[in-house]
């Protein structure tokens, strides 16, 4: 069995530290090695006291070569865990402490803080409450070193839901929160008794509300517009103790609870066996070891991680890991250094967007010499220049898409290499995938970058207005230019197939038929192969509410793309088959099966349009090209021989949205029309493309009544 990676981590997430300027991190990891499985019933627990070669010390229960039962692990640098273990992972009650003095005491599960627990930071900040997968999640209370306090709901380390925040000077807010800021309905009460009760957004009042002081009240029908002139005069002449005169530019009490300023906690507590060279059986005396800490160019101590454990057996991953000696190794290092710099530079800029932020000319070149500079770290590659496009806009987009800035930076710019694979299409682009598979980086043509920057204001407005939009989520646009080398432009976007469920089949569907089949033999097709329109053998049945939401969103997204003169986009679909017969007889654990059952019933924890969407796939015989011609099939009786429908979990989104109908595409259409039906060609006018695409979607997605 291949053990998963585990980490013991102390992170100081001060705003300037965690976001790339400078941060501390002490990580613990044991190198994964092959070991024997631990039997639930037959494993014998021995009490050992063992000093490891690297100076670490373990004292406690040992079973099948890994910590099991209760035990204490002391690292040579002073970190310590004491508590319950299960099969080499901290599970149950335990206490973790760091040399800095920070501690966590409470429940652990699978090597992470999970359940009820108390964290005390080095500055005296204290959090008591619920944790989930290493993060504050659920109800919790936090006391800050400056005297402030918060009681309420948390989500992924941020205040989210209902909560009460009390400032040390007596000011108080009670109401709704979202992503760590005051948003929703709530009441602010100042220490002198003045109150504002109304709607909030991003920490400021919006919409309707009531301002009260003493016996006086002023109603607001939209922030900054008072209901009566008399009330306006009263407000203008009245000063509040904690803020300036109420206006659109009011400065409300600063909230000292951005979790980016918090002291980090233990990331992953787990032990993995290392079989000694003298042990040929693999099940005898074993010893733990951790990989050497690596000093990154930014000065941070960290370790390499290996891919996460997968419950469904070995899964082939696309591409190859970019390692030293790879032709694009320096390019990967450069983009990691650049993104780390960009995220750190703009992380603390929380101002509102300005029209000038969308200016395509808003691009900033930064020089990265190997020896480093005042603003850039030293590195091992050749000198290069780095360009950011509209950085403030993409900073806001990442917030809009609920991307944690620190997690984003660490996923791309940690000391794990990226995986590179070629485009499954004809673009010739290269793709880079983070090891956690959350983010994808794609090299782009200059013309595509121009299209994105031109449409950026309308794109931002569209995804802000329609939270369930299926169009690609863009997180950044950058350019790398080595000294004496060519420019490489690329975008960072979300990976649609980052899923806890195995993706068994994937399709890239345009609604056209000319050339829309995979050019591979049946034996060469695997789970990473992206199939096309003529390879599709299914129609998908969605429950009524899902179907209506999906079709409505497709219409909205297509209208947006049509207005931007975009064509040649695709619906990318990933299928997870629940039935073992449809997925090479891969078995599931009970917990995963229960979670799938909840999804199919419509009450799963991860349900969102395009992500973990429950459906039924009805298999039909292989469609022919004429099948996709207009009116060739209808929703109730698709052409082809039917088979029994099977339950699936779908992932889907609209991709490749940066091709406008330029002169090149017009010439392509004219040329291909000489050899094929013009209606079957992908390169057509955006209005026709949009209509054909939507008609096609309505043929393969059916309302399951």
Curated annotation (Swiss-Prot):
Region Activation loop: start-end pairs: 661-682
Annotated SMART domains: MORN, PIPKc
Domain PIPK: 321-701
InterPro entries per UniProt: MORN, PIno-4-P-5_kinase_pln, PInositol-4-P-4/5-kinase_C_sf, PInositol-4-P-4/5-kinase_core, PInositol-4-P-5-kinase_N, PInositol-4/5-P-5/4-kinase
Biological-process GO terms, alphabetical: phosphatidylinositol metabolic process; regulation of establishment of cell polarity; root hair cell tip growth; root hair elongation; root hair initiation
Pfam families found in the cross-reference section: MORN (PF02493), PIP5K (PF01504)
Record keywords: ATP-binding, Cell membrane, Kinase, Membrane, Nucleotide-binding, Repeat, Transferase
E.C. no: 2.7.1.68
Chain positions of MORN repeats: 58-80, 81-103, 104-126, 127-149, 150-172, 173-195, 196-218
Principal location listed in the UniProt entry: membrane
Catalysed reactions, as listed in the record: a 1,2-diacyl-sn-glycero-3-phospho-(1D-myo-inositol 4-phosphate) + ATP = a 1,2-diacyl-sn-glycero-3-phospho-(1D-myo-inositol-4,5-bisphosphate) + ADP + H(+)
Disruption outcome: Basal shift of ARAC3/ROP6 and ARAC4/ROP2 positioning and broad lateral localization of D6PK in root hair-forming cells leading to basal shift of root hair positions.
Function noted in UniProt: With DRP1A and DRP2B, required for the precise coordination of polar ARAC3/ROP6 and ARAC4/ROP2 placement and subsequent root hair positioning during planar polarity formation in root hair-forming cells, probably by mediating the correct basal-to-planar polarity switching of D6PK into the polar, lipid-enriched domain.
The protein, known as: Phosphatidylinositol 4-phosphate 5-kinase 3
Gene from which this protein is expressed: PIP5K3
């Amino acid at each position: 069995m291949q053990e998963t990676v585990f980490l013991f981590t102390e992170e100081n997430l001060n705003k300037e530290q965690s976001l790339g300027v400078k941060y501390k991190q002490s990580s613990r990891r044991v190198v994964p090695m092959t070991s024997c499985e631990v039997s639930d019933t037959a494993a014998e627990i021995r009490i050992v006291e063992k000093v490891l070669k690297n100076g670490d010390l373990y004292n406690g229960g040992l079973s099948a070569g890994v910590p099991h039962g209760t035990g204490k692990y002391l690292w040579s640098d002073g970190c310590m865990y004491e508590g319950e273990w299960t099969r080499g992972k901290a599970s149950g009650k335990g206490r973790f402490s760091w040399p800095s003095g920070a501690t966590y005491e409470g429940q652990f599960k699978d090597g992470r803080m999970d359940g009820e627990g108390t964290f005390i930071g080095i500055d005296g900040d204290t959090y008591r409450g619920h944790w989930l997968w290493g993060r504050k999640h659920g109800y919790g209370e936090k006391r800050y070193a400056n005297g402030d306090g918060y009681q309420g709901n948390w989500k992924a380390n941020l205040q989210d839901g209902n909560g009460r925040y009390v400032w040390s000077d007596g000011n108080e807010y009670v109401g709704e929160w979202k992503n760590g800021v005051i948003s929703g309905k709530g009441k602010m009460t100042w220490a002198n008794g003045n109150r504002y009760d109304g709607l909030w957004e991003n920490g400021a009042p919006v919409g309707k509300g009531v301002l009260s002081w003493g016996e006086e009240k002023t109603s607001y029908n939209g922030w900054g517009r008072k209901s009566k002139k008399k009330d306006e005069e009263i407000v203008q002449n009245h000063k509040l103790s904690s803020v300036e005169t109420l206006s659109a530019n009011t400065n409300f009490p600063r909230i000292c609870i951005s979790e980016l300023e918090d002291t980090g906690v233990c990331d992953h507590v787990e032990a993995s066996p290392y079989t000694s060279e003298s042990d040929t059986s693999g099940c005898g005396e074993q010893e733990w070891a951790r990989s050497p800490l690596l000093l990154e160019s930014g000065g941070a101590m960290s370790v390499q991680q290996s891919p996460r454990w997968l419950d469904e057996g070995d899964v082939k991953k696309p591409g190859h890991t970019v390692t030293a000696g790879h032709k694009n190794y320096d390019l990967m290092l450069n983009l990691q250094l650049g993104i780390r710099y960009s995220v750190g530079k703009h992380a603390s800029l929380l101002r509102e967007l300005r029209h000038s932020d969308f200016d395509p000319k808003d691009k900033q070149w930064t020089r990265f010499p190997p020896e480093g500079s005042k603003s850039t770290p030293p590195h091992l590659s050749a000198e290069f220049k780095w360009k950011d496009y509209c950085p403030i806009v993409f900073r806001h987009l990442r917030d809009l898409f609920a991307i944690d800035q620190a997690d984003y930076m660490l996923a791309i710019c940690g000391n794990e290499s990226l995986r590179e694979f070629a485009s499954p299409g004809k673009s010739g682009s290269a793709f880079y995938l983070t090891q956690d598979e959350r983010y994808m980086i794609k090299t782009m043509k200059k013309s595509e970058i121009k299209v994105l920057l031109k449409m950026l204001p309308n794109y931002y407005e569209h995804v802000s207005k329609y939270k369930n939009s299926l169009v690609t989520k863009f997180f950044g646009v950058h350019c790398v230019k080595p000294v004496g080398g060519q420019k490489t432009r690329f975008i960072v976007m979300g990976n649609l197939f980052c899923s806890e469920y195995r993706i068994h089949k994937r399709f890239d569907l345009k609604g056209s038929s000319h050339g829309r089949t995979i050019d591979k033999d049946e034996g060469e097709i695997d789970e990473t192969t992206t199939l096309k329109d003529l390879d599709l053998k299914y129609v998908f049945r969605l429950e009524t509410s899902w179907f209506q939401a999906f079709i409505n969103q497709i219409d909205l997204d297509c209208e947006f793309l049509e207005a931007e003169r975009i064509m040649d986009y695709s619906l990318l679909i990933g299928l997870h088959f629940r039935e073992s017969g449809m997925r090479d007889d891969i078995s599931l654990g009970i917990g995963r099966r229960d979670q799938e059952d909840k999804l199919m019933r419509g009450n799963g924890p991860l349900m969102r349009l395009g992500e973990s969407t429950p459906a039924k796939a009805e298999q039909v015989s292989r469609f022919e090209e004429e099948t996709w011609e207009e009116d060739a099939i209808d929703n109730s009786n698709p052409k082809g021989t039917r088979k029994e429908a099977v339950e699936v979990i779908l992932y889907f989104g609209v991709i490749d949205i940066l091709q406008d109908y330029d002169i090149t595409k017009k010439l392509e259409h004219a040329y291909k029309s000489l050899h094929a039906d013009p209606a079957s060609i992908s390169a057509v006018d955006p209005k026709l493309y949009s209509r054909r695409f939507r008609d096609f979607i309505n043929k393969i997605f059916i309302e399951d009544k």
